[in-house]
């Protein structure tokens, strides 16, 4: 729900009156696509419900989760390649960092769920996942004219 609100706010912020700069139009389209795709992946992750007590059910749920996390990593990689308009160029570093953190998170989740589970590796994956989303939140806060440190 929070991601939907962020998407709506971003759409409103980036919608202006009159003619719009082509770079801003492209940026807005790419940001909207990124937010839509995150929302979809988030919904898919939250719908992974076929975890049963048997190994087959757990294996299927794990495969589904890994597939969605891989899609998430792909979306963050695309996000890092978005060309930010000149006024927001300085935010590109946050998009790059978000992608790097998500790649590390997904790699770590694969290790946790497919290779060798350890609490420390799961914590490491969660921390990188959180850091990735924190960078996205900073970008969205700035685009909304809010103080990301507040």
Specify the residue positions occupied by each region the protein language model found.
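Positively charged n-region of N-terminal signal peptides that target proteins for export
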Residues: 1-4
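C-terminal motif of bacterial Sec signal peptides marking the signal peptidase cleavage site
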Residues: 13-16
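Alpha-helical segments in soluble extracytoplasmic regions
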Residues: 26-100, 104-150
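Bacterial signal peptide processing site
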Residues: 18-20
């Amino acid at each position: 729900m929070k991601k939907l609100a962020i998407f709506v706010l971003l759409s409103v912020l980036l919608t202006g009156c009159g003619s719009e700069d082509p770079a801003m139009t492209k940026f807005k389209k790419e940001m909207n696509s990124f937010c839509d795709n995150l929302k979809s992946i988030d919904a898919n992750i939250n719908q992974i419900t076929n975890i049963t007590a048997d190994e087959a059910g757990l294996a299927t749920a794990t495969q589904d989760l890994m597939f969605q996390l891989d899609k998430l990593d792909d979306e963050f990689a695309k996000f890092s390649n978005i060309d930010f308009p000149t006024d927001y160029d300085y935010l590109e570093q946050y998009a790059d960092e978000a992608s790097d953190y998500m790649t590390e998170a997904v790699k770590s989740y694969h290790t946790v769920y497919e290779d060798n589970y350890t609490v420390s590796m799961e914590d490491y994956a969660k921390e990188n996942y959180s850091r990735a989303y924190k960078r996205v939140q900073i970008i969205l806060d700035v685009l909304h004219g809010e103080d990301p440190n507040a």
